[in-house]
């Protein structure tokens, strides 16, 4: 019963951190406890159909807070997104240099380990070009874990947590007909986006469907709180389960690279986030999460847990995903062409398993 065990451990961590008042405790706690259990050798796993269902549910909840008030300042988004794209490129360059100079990684592994997000594509390229798959995976997963735990705590420490985004819609379903319409439209939009291979298609498709219905004032309901909480807990478990098949010894061997690269990427992201806050009328918490170098789906769940503006955060993470995906693919293939026969690193072995995003 590994799935039941995973969900129980996730619930223990998520509810526990929530009860002690930790911001975003559901996603942070579930990810932390599942990650620790996976490192301890427990078989942590979430079935793909269940994970996909939760992506759709979270997308519906994110879209439920869309209202004219949440789109205030949308005209200034292009400048903010442009700065984010520049920040992503600077993060990759700085972190690549760090991994090369400090930890001696080969150029290709350093580039792929430095990518802020786009983990599925990065792991595919790592396996295709025989890079240090396990090291790259650990650096990426540790970065997400540190962000999910550190961001809420940091925002709370500096008094930057925000009240829930107020919507004109009720958050408890009072009409089963409207709820059925909401779920049906959002699910169809999610499936269409998935079929089109849109980045984060299930979550963004459901967000688009739900956001349209709520923004157009066509429905006035959302999912009950328990459904949203269960979805957030489960997606936290999905992120934590990425530590499966990683021994503590292997984790420790890459810990320096993980923490160091996280510090470099965070410093670059923070400098650009401060620039945006100084120039544009956005809340600090929204900007911080939008510029955080974490996985797109996890950052959207974190935005929901912290009651942030999902449209602003989602638009920025989508833009970063597209920019990083293109840049990494081009740069990786250039590196391979320049050194087609050069071995990557003494620890790299063909066939080392890759993590899926």
Predicted regions and their residues:
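Membrane-embedded alpha-helical segments of transport systems
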Residues: 117-122, 137-156, 268, 296-298, ...
């Amino acid at each position: 019963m590994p799935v039941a065990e995973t969900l129980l451990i996730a619930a223990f961590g998520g509810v526990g951190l929530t009860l002690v008042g930790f911001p975003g405790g559901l996603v942070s706690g579930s990810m932390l406890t599942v990650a620790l259990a996976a490192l301890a050798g427990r078989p942590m796993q979430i079935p793909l159909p269940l994970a996909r269902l939760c992506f759709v549910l979270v997308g519906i909840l994110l879209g439920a807070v869309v209202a004219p008030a949440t789109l205030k300042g949308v005209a200034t988004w292009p400048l903010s997104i442009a700065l984010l794209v520049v920040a992503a490129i600077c993060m990759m360059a700085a972190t690549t240099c760090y991994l090369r100079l400090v930890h001696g990684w080969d150029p290709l592994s350093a580039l792929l380990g430095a990518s802020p997000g786009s983990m599925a594509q990065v792991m595919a390229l790592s396996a295709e070009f025989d890079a240090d798959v396990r090291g790259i995976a650990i650096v990426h997963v540790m970065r997400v874990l540190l962000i999910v735990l550190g961001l809420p705590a940091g925002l709370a420490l500096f008094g930057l947590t925000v009240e829930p985004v107020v919507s004109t819609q009720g958050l408890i379903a009072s009409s089963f007909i409207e709820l059925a319409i909401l779920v049906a439209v959002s699910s169809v939009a999610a499936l269409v986006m998935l079929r089109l291979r849109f980045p984060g298609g299930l979550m963004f498709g459901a967000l688009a469907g739900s956001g349209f219905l709520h923004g157009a004032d066509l429905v006035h309901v959302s999912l009950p709180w328990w459904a949203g909480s269960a979805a957030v807990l489960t997606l936290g478990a999905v992120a934590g389960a990425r530590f499966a098949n990683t021994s503590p010894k292997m984790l420790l061997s890459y810990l320096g690279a993980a923490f160091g690269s996280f510090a470099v990427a965070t410093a670059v992201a923070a400098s650009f986030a401060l620039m945006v806050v100084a120039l544009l009328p956005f809340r600090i918490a929204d900007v911080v999460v939008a510029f955080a170098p974490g996985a797109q789906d996890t950052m959207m769940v974190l935005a929901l847990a912290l009651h942030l503006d999902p449209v602003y955060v989602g638009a920025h993470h989508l833009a970063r995903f597209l920019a990083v995906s293109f840049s990494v693919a081009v740069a990786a293939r250039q590196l391979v062409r320049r050194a087609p026969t050069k071995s990557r690193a003494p620890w790299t072995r063909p066939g080392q398993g890759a993590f899926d995003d």
